């Protein structure tokens, strides 16, 4: 562990995990996992705190709407020890054996995008908690996207 960051080696995979504070703490800080595989790298950003299991169907429906929209990666729910964590994940095809050849700017751009997506979700997931339908929350998201 270096400065709060865990570097873990699993068989042929390497994983870096760290926490990053979000400006809105509805679901805690962001948990970032970057896992290098033989043929690429997965960037995954989730929340530190799980959502209520009763919200799971609505969150999945909302995320399915989003996944059919503009995102390069995908928003999902991770099941970790029976708790459900909203997350955004993107896979990059890279060679972890040749770190000098990585486009570090691209890795940083995708990581920043993942932070942005999860930060933005803190505006929409509470609407589902308040009883708003996934379709209406998606319409809110679309309206905000078109206003940007």
Name the predicted role of every residue range.
Residues 5, 55, 125-129:
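Solvent-exposed interaction surfaces and binding hotspots enriched for charged
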Residues 124-148:
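Short, highly charged C-terminal tails/helix-capping segments
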């Amino acid at each position: 562990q270096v400065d709060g960051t865990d570097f873990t080696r699993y068989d042929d995979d390497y994983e870096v995990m760290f926490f990053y504070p979000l400006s809105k703490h509805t679901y805690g800080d962001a948990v970032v996992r970057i896992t290098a595989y033989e043929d690429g790298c997965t960037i995954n950003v989730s929340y530190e705190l799980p959502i209520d299991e009763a919200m799971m169907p609505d969150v999945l429906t909302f995320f399915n709407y989003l996944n059919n929209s503009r995102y390069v990666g995908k928003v999902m729910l991770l099941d970790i020890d029976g708790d459900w964590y909203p997350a955004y994940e993107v896979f990059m095809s890279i060679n972890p054996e040749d770190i000098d050849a990585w486009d570090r700017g691209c890795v940083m751009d995708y990581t920043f995008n993942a932070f942005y997506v999860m930060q933005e979700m803190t505006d929409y997931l509470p609407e589902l908690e308040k009883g708003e339908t996934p379709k209406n929350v998606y319409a809110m998201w679309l309206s905000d996207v078109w206003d940007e």
